[in-house]
From Swiss-Prot:
InterPro entries: Homeodomain-like_sf, HTH-type_Tx_Regulator, HTH_TetR. The keyword DNA-binding applies. Residues 12-74 form the HTH tetR-type domain. This is HTH-type transcriptional regulator SAR0097. It comes from Staphylococcus aureus (strain MRSA252).
Length: 191
């Protein structure tokens, strides 16, 4: 009996990995999986629809799972850079954090946009699962350095400037580069 349970768990882990790997491959090829039906995703992955739903109750959860490794890698890179550069001014540290986040956002724009918009009726960066982790990392940079009134409110406001809709507008309509966008934003909060 125990051997059967392990085999079932092994099969389940295998199926989950197949689904994630297939979707990651599609994303790398430029496919927008947010437009695909769950039945199509199951078919493309070579699993049954029931198997797909056992692992991921919704397309949003599937997209979040796809992003989990990428998000963790982003935070590892940020923490490594910050650890190596403890003497940097707060602005430089925050610039690195937000640059790394924008790198992730630009590389996975449609997926993060889908997560933002499907998490609630409002389109907000607050809806991304790692929002609090990102905000807490920013808060840490201010500890013992700057006293900013209403820091929590200001960071919520600042991070909402990273919503997919607004960032797309800034990049494509106002023609700002990533660094120009960050400089203008940081000037508002850190001058």
């Amino acid at each position: 009996m125990e051997k059967n349970q392990r085999k079932k768990r092994s099969d389940a882990e295998y199926n989950q990995q197949i689904i994630l790997t297939t979707m990651e491959d599609l994303l790398e090829q430029g496919e927008d999986i947010s437009t695909k039906k769950m039945s199509d995703i199951a078919k493309i992955s070579g699993v049954g629809v029931g198997t797909l739903y056992r692992h991921f109750e919704s397309k949003t959860l599937l997209c979040q799972a796809i992003m989990d490794k990428k998000v963790d890698q982003m935070f590892i890179e940020i923490e490594d850079i910050l650890a190596e550069n403890t003497q940097w001014p707060v602005r430089d540290k925050i610039n690195v954090i937000l640059t790394k986040y924008l790198d992730l956002k630009e590389a996975n724009f449609t997926t993060l946009n889908f997560i933002e918009k499907s998490s609630s009726h409002s389109s907000s960066v607050i809806n991304i699962p790692f929002f609090e982790r990102l905000k807490n990392l920013l808060i840490q940079q201010f500890e013992n350095v700057h006293s900013i009134a209403d820091l929590d409110f200001k960071l919520n406001l600042m991070l909402n400037a990273f919503s997919s809709d607004f960032y797309y507008f800034v990049k494509h309509n106002q023609k700002l580069t990533k660094q120009q966008f960050l400089d203008k934003l940081l000037d508002l909060y850190l001058k």
